[in-house]
Design a protein with these regions (language model features):
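The alpha-helix within a helix-turn-helix
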Residues: 11, 22, 50
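Residues within the helices of the helix-turn-helix
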Residues: 8, 19, 33, 47, ...
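Short alpha-helical DNA-recognition segment
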Residues: 15-33
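Short amphipathic helical patch at the helix-1/turn junction of helix-turn-helix
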Residues: 12, 37-40
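A short, Lys/Arg-rich alpha-helix, primarily the initiator
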Residues: 1-19
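Short, basic-rich loop-to-helix N-cap that marks the start of a DNA-contacting helix
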Residues: 39-51
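Short, charged recognition helix plus adjacent turn
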Residues: 9-10, 34, 61-69
Length: 69
């Protein structure tokens, strides 16, 4: 399962808000909504976020194993 938890940690560490992503950097509010709900994003979006946040992919997402219930 993909988690965007590192993305929110990176935002906090870089002192960047979602508002700034949208209005200062022109990032899509729809993509932020998708990420909040654990939906897929494109590699192009990952590349854009890495550029804005000056981080690697592991600063945006992480993979965790799903537990069988």
């Amino acid at each position: 399962m993909i988690s965007y938890r590192p993305f929110y940690n990176t935002l906090y560490e870089k002192n960047i808000t979602e508002y700034q992503l949208i209005f200062k950097f022109g990032f899509s509010a729809n993509i932020l909504h998708r990420m909040k709900h654990g939906k897929a994003i494109t590699t192009s979006t990952l590349d854009t976020l890495c550029g804005i946040l000056d981080c690697n992919v592991d600063g945006i997402l992480e993979h965790t194993k799903e537990e069988n219930v």
